[in-house]
Amino acid sequence: MGAYILRRLALMIPTIVGIMGISFLVIQFAPGGPVEQVVAQLTGQGDSASDRLSGGGDLMGQSGGFDESGSKYRGAQGLDPELIKKLEKQFGFDKPPLTRFLEMMWNYIRFDFGDSFFRNSSVIDLIIDKLPVSASLGFWILIISYVISIPLGIKKAVSDGSTFDVWTSGIIIIGYAVPSFLFGILLIVLFAGGSFFDWFPLRGLVSDNFDQLNWWQKIIDYFWHLTLPLIALSLSAFATTTLLTKNSFIDEIKKQYVVTARAKGLSERKVLYGHVFRNAMLIVIAGFPGAFISAFFTGSLLIENIFSLDGLGRLGYLSVVNRDYPIVFGTLFIFSLMGLVVGLLSDLIYTWIDPRIDFERRDV
């Protein structure tokens, strides 16, 4: 097991380098950049969101074409070339791409993520500041999905092939197939003052007068704001855990020890929860870390933007739009590293739950 852990840890290095390298390369060829952002502001261009996404008006990428004045940044005509050089030095673009990448990776290895280009704060402080919002979404989605999915999966396994099983499978698959942001938009239209009811707030995690509320009013206000985002995210979170639980129970129910337990006269409930449950839930429990990371990082980006929740997903989106590269690459590095570590942790949990799994190589 020790050798397996060392191999996995060693593989994390080229994996991280590959992820960061490909992302860095894509950024180099993408239109726009922080220099163009400042140039666009100085020249009065690129005020709209669509302009920002395309790099600001008719501005070109970092490696884009030249304008009539000889600058490699379109829209920079009329600006002092020394100012352009200062901007390049400020954002680090006075160095070759390979040098910038190597310096960035060296800093990240030391967990030095630098400062945001436009937010006057360090990347790590911004992540810590936005973390509670995303953590709240991820935590409650995970709890809700497991609390509902496990009993539902057991019920589907017991009634495999029944009308209940068929209909719930259809509903689960539809919920999984439809993107969560579409559910979010539908919920806003229906229940957040869109066209029908105005029952829930449209934006934010808490009300403006949150600090003036007493403790129980704060709890109600907090969940009142979370209701629609959680519903939108949870509808697509049930499928994997529910079907995994169902299939795991079906596999266990067919085994000989279940037949023996029933032959002894044990009730079906005793067989299911006294014998089958412990074995069937091993794979579900072992997947808990991976499910947490999935709920924590992947599902909330669009939901945070739709409901104006100031979390990591919204931070990442705005950073990409504004070409704030330290935040983009810093969050990518942290999330990639956490994903790899959690993947290793999931494998170790498998071995802890089921000692028959050891991941050791055996000669045939």
From Swiss-Prot:
Gene inactivation effect: The deletion mutant is hypersensitive to ampicillin, in a manner only partly dependent on the beta-lactamase AmpC. Deletion of the yejABEF operon leads to the accumulation of anhydromuramyl tri-, tetra- and pentapeptides in large quantities in the extracellular milieu. The yejABEF mutant displays cell swelling and lysis as well as a severe growth defect.
Localization per record: Cell inner membrane
Keywords: Cell inner membrane, Cell membrane, Membrane, Peptide transport, Protein transport, Transmembrane, Transmembrane helix, Transport
Domain of life assignment: Bacteria
Gene Ontology BP annotations: microcin transport; peptide transport; protein transport; transmembrane transport
GO CC aspect terms: plasma membrane
Principal subcellular localization: membrane
Subunit field text: The complex is composed of one ATP-binding protein (YejF), two transmembrane proteins (YejB and YejE) and a solute-binding protein (YepA or YejA).
Summary of the function given for this chain in its UniProt record: Part of the ABC transporter complex YejBEF-YepA involved in the uptake of muropeptides, the breakdown products of cell wall peptidoglycan. The import of muropeptides into the cell enables peptidoglycan recycling, which is vital for cell wall integrity in this bacterium. Is also probably part of the ABC transporter complex YejABEF, which is likely involved in broad-spectrum peptide import. Responsible for the translocation of the substrate across the membrane.
The protein, known as: Peptidoglycan transport system permease protein YejB
GN (gene name): yejB
